[in-house]
Amino acid sequence: MDIETANALTAFTARYCDAWHEMNGTWPQSEELYGVPSPCIITTMDDKILWQPQPFSLEQTVNAVERAMDIVVQPAVHAFYTTQFAGDMQARFANETMTLLQTWSENDFQRVQENLIGHLVTQKRLKLAPTLFIATLDSELDVIAVCNLNGEVIKETLGTRKRDVLAPSLADFLNQLEPVL
């Protein structure tokens, strides 16, 4: 596993949870994840849950993606999706506000891998370099992704060759993220 990426993700998650504690006096809350089983759930309330990150309990790889696409996935992406179970987190990098995607549960991990495969299949059809998304933006056409050829974190316009490099590595990117509540 890419320890640098795992540590950067854990550190950002701690910053995010600390910000929730400072602002709200609780662990992060989610209405979207209400009713969705996860080891992260601390408390279920009327229409929301409180969550805290939990250690990832499965094999720490996205091998299903590698097998399906016959590629080797960047080690940083393995670490990103298999370091922890957690809720998605709002974040800011430079002027970009995003939702950092996380694996919520064992079942969610399967769904995440299926979505990554679908993304890669589309890119292959369009003859685009392979990327693996890690965050969504308000614009449904843009995502934050890791280029699988060189490990750079990019802002990518889906279905096009438009890509802007944001950071040389996923660890660098995560270390620069600021929590947004």
Curated annotation (Swiss-Prot):
Disulfide bonds: none
Family: Belongs to the Syd family.
Organism this protein belongs to: Enterobacter sp. (strain 638)
Taxon lineage: Bacteria, Pseudomonadati, Pseudomonadota, Gammaproteobacteria, Enterobacterales
Main function: Interacts with the SecY protein in vivo. May bind preferentially to an uncomplexed state of SecY, thus functioning either as a chelating agent for excess SecY in the cell or as a regulatory factor that negatively controls the translocase function.
GO CC terms: cytoplasmic side of plasma membrane
Keywords: Cell inner membrane, Cell membrane, Membrane
The name this protein goes by in its record: Protein Syd
Membrane topology: Peripheral membrane protein
Intracellular or extracellular location(s): Cell inner membrane
Pfam families: Syd
Matching InterPro entries: Syd, Syd_sf
